[in-house]
Curated annotation (Swiss-Prot):
Family of this protein: Belongs to the GatB/GatE family. GatB subfamily.
GO molecular function, one term: ATP binding
Database matches in Gene3D superfamilies: 1.10.10.410, GatB domain, N-terminal subdomain
Class of this enzyme: ligase
BP terms from Gene Ontology: glutaminyl-tRNAGln biosynthesis via transamidation; translation
Protein name according to UniProt: Aspartyl/glutamyl-tRNA(Asn/Gln) amidotransferase subunit B
Enzyme Commission code: 6.3.5.-
Subunit (UniProt): Heterotrimer of A, B and C subunits.
Function: Allows the formation of correctly charged Asn-tRNA(Asn) or Gln-tRNA(Gln) through the transamidation of misacylated Asp-tRNA(Asn) or Glu-tRNA(Gln) in organisms which lack either or both of asparaginyl-tRNA or glutaminyl-tRNA synthetases. The reaction takes place in the presence of glutamine and ATP through an activated phospho-Asp-tRNA(Asn) or phospho-Glu-tRNA(Gln).
InterPro entries xref list: Asn/Gln-tRNA_amidoTrfase_suB/E, Asn/Gln-tRNA_Trfase_suB/E_cat, Asn/Gln_amidotransferase, Asn/Gln_tRNA_amidoTrase-B-like, GatB, GatB_C_1, GatB_Yqey_C_2, Gln-tRNA_amidoTrfase_suB_CS
Keyword line: ATP-binding, Ligase, Nucleotide-binding, Protein biosynthesis
Catalysed reactions, as listed in the record: L-glutamyl-tRNA(Gln) + L-glutamine + ATP + H2O = L-glutaminyl-tRNA(Gln) + L-glutamate + ADP + phosphate + H(+); L-aspartyl-tRNA(Asn) + L-glutamine + ATP + H2O = L-asparaginyl-tRNA(Asn) + L-glutamate + ADP + phosphate + 2 H(+)
Amino acid sequence: MTQWEVVIGLETHAQLSTVSKIFSGASTQFGAQPNTQACPVDLALPGVLPVLNRGAVERAIRFGLAIGATVAPRSVFARKNYFYPDLPKGYQISQYEIPVVQGGQITIQVPANEKAGKQAYSKTVNLTRAHLEEDAGKSLHEDFAGMTGIDLNRAGTPLLEIVTEPEMRSAAEAVAYAKALHGLVMWLGICDGNMQEGSFRCDANVSVRPVGQEKFGTRAEIKNLNSFRFLEDAINYEVRRQIELIEDGGEVVQETRLYDPDKRETRSMRSKEDAHDYRYFPDPDLMPLVIGADWIARVKGEMPELPAAMQQRFVEQYGVSAYDAGVLTSTKAMAEYFEALVAKAGAANAKLAANWLMGDVSSQLNRDGIDIDACPVSAAQLALVLQRIADGTISNKIAKEIFVTIWDEKAADEGAADRIIEAKGLKQISDTGALEAIIDEVLAANAKSVEEFRAGKDKAFNALVGQAMKATKGKANPQQVNELLKKKLG
């Protein structure tokens, strides 16, 4: 039986976070009434000329530097000719032979798949190019009975199309790459990453070939996948479809396909064009884009610290594990919250801060369906909670209760933790005399557990600790309780 190898390449359209469009001054704001953000340039009225948005170019440079690519000192805009109702000019301004960003790579972390018996691993995906282009408008098929409406608000919106080499070998790798890229463009501040609004969408080129064969199989391109789940489902379906088709004696046709999320299948949209079908030629209305070394140096100087460098710094500066550093730098907002937390709580509490962020804080964020930048507990408020754990004022259990109280109250005061501790009398009991008296009562009331412990049953000791903590309503210092119990039990 033939063993098949999957070959995947992704083309990702990232909408650049400029206020105006790539060749006009019209707004890029999402959600406006149809055709209220389309100026004469976007409408392709006679006599208008495009003017390149400098901000879009700088965002492309920033991306190129982040992935270790070559930023072309000279690149050219080209006309991509095709007809579609939502493309007013009859062509799209893009880049073809000389893109602004050439090469580069992104390292991805592919998670383990226990069902398939596969362990987690890392892989470097090479990029072919990233080029600037304008978006088309939008066809509205459901708003008018028997007719199609055209909304040109998106026409001219700046895009960075990021193209990989066909190096991914599974849907899991493709999703891992898409997530890594998504995180990077948001980290760099060049794209808001909003997939629901179409700011980040992927086209997947999928083919299969017998294992060991060098020649690529015929590919199908699945267009406009705007969620990671859709990307994974679409690729998996397409792989199955192609293998079944070939094994049944058929041939895969080069075509463009759409993914139907309701049926969880791809369906044919049109035959796939080759580059020559678009009759690319340099746009005579736009000068070649020249990017000098001084411009690149200035953009580089304004770039944020990149995730990989920050991960290494967290390991060295704060003593957290490489895994923890990866989680803490999963988003820029998470990394900034962690650094603000450590700055307030003290470097000595860095590991405690990391544990809380990855544990209780992340749990609450998931519960409420929000991101860290919308966390109702500020870094300063949480830092005070951690300081009170560290100085023995409260136990970790009580700290969790205080944290949830601050979260639910949406308290604004930085000293909320101290206020709640005083108001509810939550200070940890650390007085040895008071604890000894409580433990004596616990031992007297739990003679059976004492006997079991002395008979060698360690679980009985944990039961006694639990009774002591219950007697103090969780306010006893757990470490002291353990020490005093061991002392009294001999």
